[in-house]
C-alpha cells in the first residue's frame, strides 16, 4: 500500500500515511502488551472477526488502488484530469492497524518473543515505543521506493498497469491469511 501511495502521490504526501501506521501500531502494540493478546486466546472468534474485517477493508483498498487516477503530471496535455484520489491519511492508516491481521501478528509475536509476560507498565510502554520506532523507517522504505518508481512510471499506461498490479498483489497477500477458513 505504501509503495503504491509513494508512486501515486509522492513521498511527501505519503508521510501522514506512514506516521499513521507507526502511531496506530504503537497504540495497538501497547494494548497487546497490556493483555489484549490474552483476550484473543480466550475468545478466538474476536480474532476471526478482525481477520475478516481486515480482509474486506484490504479488498476495498485494492479496489481503490486499481481505480486511482494518475496524477495530473502523468496525463497527456489536453486530457481532462479525473477526480484526484487522495492518499490514506494519518487517522485512516492508524485505524487500519486495528483490522490489519499482519499488524496483529507482528504485535503479538513481538511481545510474546521479546517481553516477559510479567513485565510492568514501563517495560510494556518502552517495548511498544521501540516496536513503533523500528516500524517507521521500515514503512518509510516502501514509500521512498514508490516515490523513486514514480519517475519511471511517467507514462499513463505504465502507471495504470502498476496500480492494477499492486491491487492484485494486495488481494493475493490475503490468501495465507484466509486459507485457514
Give the ranges of each region predicted by the language model.
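Juxtamembrane transmembrane-helix termini in multi-pass membrane transport proteins
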Residues: 1-48, 106-132, 143-144
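Short loop-to-helix capping motifs
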Residues: 10, 100-101, 155-156
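Alpha-helical membrane-protein architecture signal
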Residues: 12, 83-95, 122-126
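Residue-level signature of transmembrane alpha-helical cores of multipass secondary-active transporters
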Residues: 21, 89, 93-97, 131-135
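Hydrophobic alpha-helical transmembrane segments in multi-pass integral membrane proteins
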Residues: 29-33, 99-108, 168-181
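Selective transmembrane alpha-helices of multi-pass membrane proteins
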Residues: 42-73, 135-142, 152-181
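Flexible cytoplasmic inter-helical loops of multi-pass small-molecule transporters
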Residues: 67-85
